[in-house]
């Protein structure tokens, strides 16, 4: 099938690779290069980098609302466009241009977690499961009818990065199935009940309040890992906590217990991966070797 691909971050790359292997990708649309790193040099998106490695033409318009951009898009003569974490709103002329419309790969069980951060929000909310939906796009935010859906369990120690990688691979597999069965799929309108929105993650959500229950702090650490990274102050230094599990232990909220376990309002969490500023992530034994925490140490955020 003759396709346009529209995506930008790492999550989109496996989908691009799968489509390139099985279909004709006539053009790749992604966000333009932006300043990044210490030198603030323009850095292309992961999708642009991979598309160029594959020899695919790349476009990164700052808007798709101009008549010129819409004419260029339509002139590609694609049968369908596949969209995954692209980063721009698609106006109606773009949605209407491909013969079979635009298909979106969304990382949640719609209508739950429409919007920008569905993977983070599913873990933060303590959802038992999530999944991938292939959706026929329309003008609303993730409101289109669902063509195909697959569920997956969220593991008790799974982080955003873990789930991100699994769902990315699932999306690549599912879109191939959807494209192959497009003539037979029946669009299923999303129900009005159960709609929730996955707002962008704010950095203010990352500071840990140790008076909260262990179950909530466990979800906060896993649901913000690796970015922006839940953090606490230890010995006056900000430390990111990247992996954890709920554990037994008693003490005042924030008390550091043996083995880098920290007491919460109720229960405790065992930190299994931590990162000091300017350092790489470390497991507890290595972390404590270079950053000993004397008996009576406390974790806090202010």
Swiss-Prot record:
The protein's enzyme class: transferase
UniProt EC number: 2.1.2.9
A molecular function GO annotation: methionyl-tRNA formyltransferase activity
Record's compositionally biased regions (Basic and acidic residues): 276-288
Reaction(s) catalysed by this chain's protein: L-methionyl-tRNA(fMet) + (6R)-10-formyltetrahydrofolate = N-formyl-L-methionyl-tRNA(fMet) + (6S)-5,6,7,8-tetrahydrofolate + H(+)
Matching Gene3D superfamilies: 3.40.50.12230
UniProt-listed CDD domains: FMT_core_Met-tRNA-FMT_N, Met_tRNA_FMT_C
Residues at which (6S)-5,6,7,8-tetrahydrofolate binds: 108-111
Annotated GO CC locations: cytosol
Keywords attached to this entry: Protein biosynthesis, Transferase
UniProt superkingdom: Bacteria
Chain segments carrying region Disordered: 276-302
Role of this protein: Attaches a formyl group to the free amino group of methionyl-tRNA(fMet). The formyl group appears to play a dual role in the initiator identity of N-formylmethionyl-tRNA by promoting its recognition by IF2 and preventing the misappropriation of this tRNA by the elongation apparatus.
Family: Belongs to the Fmt family.
HAMAP family: Formyl_trans
Protein name: Methionyl-tRNA formyltransferase
Organism lineage: Bacteria, Pseudomonadati, Pseudomonadota, Alphaproteobacteria, Rhodobacterales
Gene designation per UniProt: fmt
